[in-house]
Regions:
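PP2C/PPM-type serine/threonine phosphatase catalytic domain
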Residues: 1-234
């Protein structure tokens, strides 16, 4: 049996007076599992906040066709918003394992021990350069293009989502618990800068979320969202 033990979520704009282009789906029961997600509207194109909302709404209706159906809906927007685009990273956890859908640069992590293991790959110019072994990670720190997205739910680029499955035995810790974190780039930027908290903080969803939020709020660089969830497998 799959039991939701704890969850912590937030979704804030970079500045209180501006629109938040992120949307989240806190954990929701869906058939025999739980569904949750983060969508980050792409900056630079008008209507990012509309596109991310469309993605979350379509995910709740039909996860299997969320990418194609969201694009269909975005194409129906008025001319003013014809370039509206969004990323989307979602998780659907059942007793069998984790189904992941991903496009863009939000990130999904699994906690193993006291470390977070990134399970999604960024669809960015930087990641492409890494994949092609043109630069090392260290060299790329000095290069522009970290936030240039190569695919999204968008009419402006070819849509190439990743969809994959991780068996439950690769997710569970020694207590038969599963910890999953989805972050928009405005959140994981601050986690990756210093990817550690105390052991006590790493063992608690609420403490982790509060500690990361405190770190971000000192100098946010973008809208920032987190969906952090803990499950027990009986």
């Amino acid at each position: 049996m799959l039991n939701l033990i704890a969850s912590s979520t937030y979704c804030f704009p970079k500045e209180s007076e501006r629109k938040n282009q992120d949307h989240i789906l806190p954990p929701q029961q869906y058939h025999n599992g739980y569904l949750f997600a983060v969508a980050d509207g792409v900056g630079g194109y008008k209507g990012g906040e509309i596109a991310s909302q469309i993605a979350i709404q379509n995910l709740m209706r039909d996860p299997q066709n969320v990418f194609t159906q969201s694009l269909v809906e975005i194409k129906k927007l008025s001319e003013e918003y014809h370039r509206a685009s969004t990323t989307l990273t979602f998780a659907y956890l059942t007793e069998e394992g984790l189904h992941i859908g991903h496009i863009g640069d939000c990130r999904l992590y699994i906690k193993l021990g006291n470390k977070l293991r990134q399970k999604t790959k960024d669809h960015t110019t930087h990641q492409r350069l890494l994949d092609e072994k043109i630069y090392t990670k260290k060299e790329l720190k000095e290069q522009p293009g970290k936030n240039i997205i190569t695919t999204a739910i968008s009419t402006q680029v070819e849509m190439k989502p990743d969809e994959f499955f991780i068996p439950i035995d690769e997710l569970k810790d020694e207590n038969n618990e599963v910890f999953i974190y989805i972050m928009s780039d405005g959140a994981h930027h601050f986690w990756e800068h210093r990817p550690r908290f105390s052991d006590a903080t790493m063992q608690s969803i609420s403490r982790f979320s509060a500690a990361l939020q405190k770190r971000i709020e000192k100098a946010p660089t973008d809208d920032y969202s987190l969906v952090a969830v803990q499950f027990k497998i009986d």
